[in-house]
């Protein structure tokens, strides 16, 4: 005999099917079988919609319920790799950095490395610089020390430099040497990596996220997600992109794409491999903006084309990292060529990742093409000073040009690019509204968007970019019951309260994945 699914009726001060301010909120939402059954204004209507079943009833009082948030470009794996390392995210001075390193390394044996996490940047420090080797040596720790900043930069103390047989007294930028140092430090076990990923995904659920698009995995990393899914421990719905390593030559890129497992069912509710990730240009300091040299490009147009064709044949989807306008144009050329050749039916499966620098003619081309843009304004928030310094005032004024993209009709959704920019969606939404950088005051104020539009970029538009089968990013009958309960209505109140707005409850498929107060455990039946 098939067991009937549990029906739950949630009651709150306001339940929003979407984040449009003109909609009259509901008071009750009925959930069964992981789907939304009904939204009603009265308790009697909710009881009727539950069809007489013995429903669990949860009253969330003054809470506001809305669709769960979706991050279309995140690096949960990078955050997971930092879980066991010295955290520098909260450091504000060189002294803070050194104190964190000292605390992490104190008492360790001489053969144990002290390694910091990557998710910080020297611009957050009052001194605006990295620690020096001399400062690390002065800590007097018995074992080697490596202070990482991002994935491609590290500072070594003298013991670590000796282990690597490098005498250069400057920040290390050689990826191979950084990888060697990490190997010497001792990589975590597969079990530890799996647990660390589960920890990070749980933290993301606590931020109100219900779906993510992980921007690059290899075979071993895919297995981590699969193991959590098979154990029933994935708290979020996860779309994954298969990563072509940055700087790969064409032959290597083709080999990596050929090694990609065939995507599974498009309607897998929790884990999908949806495309290939490739790199076309650099980051803020070396993006392919107008005037940049050829070194800004990781690929030539001739090298990009076979990657696009092989990716579409293998998976039907692709996301290309393109920060500068020239890189965006190169990717768009390849995408339009692929569409003309019939290699893709839905242009929305062809995604440009970042698109932080887009000139008006490029924006018009994007709109006409129908391709998608995963936009990451949090990068501009986090690195506002770098954007101004490397791009100049004019280009900085239109960095992450969300207002222009939306006005032109571009298929655009939001993502964080966390874990170095903030993964917290409410922080990114606040920045989209205020355009106040982490430092240096406003940046790109002319590209601000209204609060409801910012939420739409993290919900309905994000679900459209994912191309999911079941409705998501909205709360309506038949949609996935992915929702978040805020302590207050996020569409109203001072904008500066948004980043700290309490997330009371996060449900994915009607299942609580963040419930610190045990609200769902106290549900009444009847």
Positions of predicted regions on the chain:
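Divalent metal-binding segments
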Residues: 3-12, 16-17, 21-255, 274, ...
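Non-cysteine beta-strand/loop elements that form the S-adenosyl-L-methionine
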Residues: 75, 268-284, 371-381
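His/Asp/Glu-enriched, well-ordered alpha-helical/loop segment
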Residues: 195, 309-319, 323-350, 354-355, ...
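Anion (oxyanion) recognition and catalysis
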Residues: 205, 267, 312, 367, ...
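Acidic (Asp/Glu)-rich catalytic clusters
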Residues: 228-232, 260-271, 366-370
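Short, charged, surface-exposed secondary-structure boundary motifs
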Residues: 248-252, 383-387, 446, 516-518
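Short, Lys/Arg- and Gly-enriched loop/turn segments at beta-strand edges
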Residues: 490-497
């Amino acid at each position: 005999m098939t067991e009937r699914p549990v029906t739950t009726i949630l009651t709150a001060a306001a339940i929003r099917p979407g984040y449009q301010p003109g909609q009259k909120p509901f008071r009750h939402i009925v959930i069964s079988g992981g789907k939304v059954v009904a939204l009603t204004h009265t308790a009697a209507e909710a009881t009727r919609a539950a069809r007489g079943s013995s429903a669990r009833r949860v009253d969330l009082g003054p809470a506001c319920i809305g669709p769960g948030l979706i991050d279309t470009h995140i690096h949960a794996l990078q955050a997971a790799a930092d879980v066991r390392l010295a955290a520098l995210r909260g450091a504000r001075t060189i002294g803070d950095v050194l104190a964190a390193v000292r605390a992490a390394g104190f008492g360790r044996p001489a053969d144990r490395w002290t390694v910091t996490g990557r998710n910080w940047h020297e611009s957050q420090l009052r001194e605006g610089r990295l620690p020096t080797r001399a400062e690390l040596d002065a800590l007097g720790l018995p074992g080697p020390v490596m202070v990482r900043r991002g994935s491609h930069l590290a500072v070594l103390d003298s013991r670590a430099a000796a282990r690597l047989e490098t005498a250069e007294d400057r920040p290390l930028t050689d990826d191979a040497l950084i990888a060697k140092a990490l190997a010497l430090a001792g990589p975590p076990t597969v079990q530890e990596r799996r647990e660390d990923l589960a920890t990070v995904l749980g933290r993301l659920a606590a931020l109100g996220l219900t779906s993510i698009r992980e921007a690059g995995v290899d075979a071993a990393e895919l297995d981590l997600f699969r193991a959590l899914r098979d154990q029933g421990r994935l708290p979020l719905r996860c779309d994954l992109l298969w990563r072509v390593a940055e700087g790969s030559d064409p032959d290597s890129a083709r080999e990596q794409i050929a090694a990609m497992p065939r995507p599974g069912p498009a309607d897998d509710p929790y884990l999908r491999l949806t495309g290939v990730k490739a790199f076309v240009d650099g980051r803020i300091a070396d993006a392919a903006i107008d005037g940049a040299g050829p070194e800004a490009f990781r690929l030539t147009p001739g090298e990009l084309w076979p990657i696009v064709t092989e990716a579409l044949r293998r998976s039907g989807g692709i996301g290309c990292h393109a920060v500068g306008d020239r890189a965006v144009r190169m990717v768009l050329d390849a995408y339009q060529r692929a569409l003309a050749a019939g290699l893709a039916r839905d242009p929305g499966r062809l995604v440009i990742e970042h698109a932080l620098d887009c000139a008006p003619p490029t924006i018009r081309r994007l709109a006409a093409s129908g391709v998608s843009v995963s936009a990451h304004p949090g990068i501009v928030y986090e690195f506002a000073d770098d954007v101004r310094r490397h791009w100049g005032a004019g280009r900085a004024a239109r960095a992450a040009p969300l207002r222009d993209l939306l006005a032109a009709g571009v298929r655009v959704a939001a993502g964080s690019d966390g874990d170095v920019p903030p993964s917290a969606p409410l922080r990114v939404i606040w920045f989209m509204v205020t355009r106040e950088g982490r430092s240096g005051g406003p940046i790109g104020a002319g590209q601000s968007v209204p609060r409801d539009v910012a939420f739409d970029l993290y919900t309905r538009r994000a679900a459209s970019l994912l191309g999911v089968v079941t409705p998501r990013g909205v709360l309506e009958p038949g949609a996935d019951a992915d929702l978040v309960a805020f302590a207050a209505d996020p569409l109203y109140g001072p904008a500066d309260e948004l980043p700290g707005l309490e997330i009371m409850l996060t449900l994915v498929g009607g299942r609580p994945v963040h419930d610190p107060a045990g609200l769902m455990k106290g549900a009444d039946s009847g």
